[in-house]
């Protein structure tokens, strides 16, 4: 039974090349659809892809056609009703339009829905976080992390079975068999010609013929004894580890969980930080994340407790800033780490504590931070904390603050804060 082996590089995804070309061509429309999808689905839902809809008008291809008006003769196939000179009535079309339009239904009008297709989880996250980066990331020279990446470096005679190069091994086998048997094959050919000459000679020379046959048999046995492949022939792909220097960074996530933060505000803060957490883990391999929750007291927690703990209390923002400063001094020396922070709050704070927050940021944190982002989640007028932070924004280039009013503002604000700087 014949067997067909599919050696095409795309494997099961036979149309992968066409898909990639389509996504490159309509990248802007796809990115807009992905940005809209952020607000429709849970940010934590990253195990699945996303259905992307592109308006049909955006994917129309250019075409050549006759302009409107004018007189022209044309032969239409299948015409059995009209003759030259007849006037054709305009079709009665309804207002069928694209997708979910407000037009009336019509049996004759033709509408066109949006083009909808699904992108994978990786494609969704790639588009979501494209053009985003940690601002002001510097290559610190002290205790720089060194990543090792493997690169192909020829072949070697020993290695793991998974790294064996079949083609190169067979080439070595052919070369060895040719070298070991070429002389014997040449001698065998000469003896066979000699045997044929003796057999056709008169009178017969039986002793000489038997001697030649014995030599030929021994030569054939020697040629057949050459193994098809030997351990000497095996060649393995060789990989070398080359150092690739990279910067190490730590991101502090500070979130207010005081009693003034209602559940809707906490949900917005959680969504922002989940988005940030996914971005950091997907974009950078060497980024540590420190989670700090605070009310009247601040506490370093793990990821699960940061997002799902029900603990609450009053509001003293400076407690979180003090704890961050202590952690930086204890674990993240400024000369070795690029330090980033993102703080989320509803703006409520003990009035006497807001100047203290400004003082801590001015004297201790901002001089050591590459970037500090503050988001205030509120629809109300801003209070003392916002006004104190406005003074910081005027004095420090590495400090940014934004206001989030609703879920729809999360992704646009996130992109503004972490937009990749172009050279």
UniProtKB/Swiss-Prot annotation:
The protein here is known as UPF0229 protein VV2350
The similarity annotation says: Belongs to the UPF0229 family.
Gly residues bias spans: 93-102
Q: Which InterPro entries match?
A: UPF0229
Region span, Disordered? 81-111
- Taxonomically, which superkingdom? Bacteria
